[in-house]
């Protein structure tokens, strides 16, 4: 057996051991530990809205991120057991309204038990390209068409192509970190 063959077999053996360690580590992460870890991943607070054949609906989410700028696309994650899930799935349009620091009350309204019909009585709303409700004084609003969805675990991931954007300058973002609302502050 050549040195190269021995080295290759040794590397393959090590890779096999690493894969096993990775599988064991993955299997040891429970839901509570994952959620605790995710609470330390600061994120913007968004009110996600829709309107269409299935009706008007909205919820609060931090599970939003950009995918690509060509074409402008972002993703939104929504639990399939959420009361608003079918409305969003059927409408296939949504608006990601990123809240400003002074709008924590809207996060609580759209994230709580407030009846859907009463949620849109708070804030000032308009529409852009898709007819999904746009919060007029949100930090930024991304008006989107859902172009693809993917089921992962308990959630669907909606891939959303941005059709229109509205910006409000001069405001600070509302963030969620360590299970609390906060504002970002520049450190450099």
From Swiss-Prot:
S-S pairs: none
Example GO molecular function: FMN binding
Catalytic activity: FMNH2 + NAD(+) = FMN + NADH + 2 H(+)
Keywords: Flavoprotein, FMN, NAD, Oxidoreductase
UniProt GO BP: nitrogen utilization; uracil catabolic process
Keyword NAD applies: yes
Enzyme class label: oxidoreductase
Domain of life: Bacteria
Family matches, as Gene3D superfamilies: Electron Transport, Fmn-binding Protein, Chain A (2.30.110.10)
EC numbers, comma separated: 1.5.1.42
Family stated for the protein in its record: Belongs to the non-flavoprotein flavin reductase family. RutF subfamily.
Role of this protein: Catalyzes the reduction of FMN to FMNH2 which is used to reduce pyrimidine by RutA via the Rut pathway.
UniProt name for this protein: FMN reductase (NADH) RutF
Species name: Acinetobacter baylyi (strain ATCC 33305 / BD413 / ADP1)
């Amino acid at each position: 057996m050549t040195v190269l063959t021995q080295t290759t077999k040794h590397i393959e053996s090590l890779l096999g051991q690493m894969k096993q360690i990775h599988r064991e580590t993955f299997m040891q992460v429970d839901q509570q530990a994952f959620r605790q870890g995710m609470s330390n991943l600061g994120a913007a607070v968004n009110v996600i809205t829709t309107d269409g054949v299935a009706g008007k609906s909205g919820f609060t989410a931090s599970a939003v991120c950009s995918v690509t700028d060509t074409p402008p696309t972002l993703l939104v994650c929504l639990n399939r057991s959420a009361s608003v899930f079918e409305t969003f799935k059927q409408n296939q349009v949504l608006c990601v309204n990123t809240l400003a620091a002074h709008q924590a009350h809207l996060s609580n309204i759209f994230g709580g038990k407030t009846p859907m019909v009463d949620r849109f009585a708070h804030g000032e709303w308009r529409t852009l390209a898709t007819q999904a409700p746009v919060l007029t004084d949100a930090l930024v609003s991304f008006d989107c068409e859902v172009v693809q969805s993917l089921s992962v675990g308990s959630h669907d991931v909606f891939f959303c192509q941005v059709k229109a954007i509205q910006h409000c300058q001069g405001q600070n973002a509302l963030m969620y970190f360590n299970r609390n609302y906060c504002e970002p502050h520049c450190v450099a």
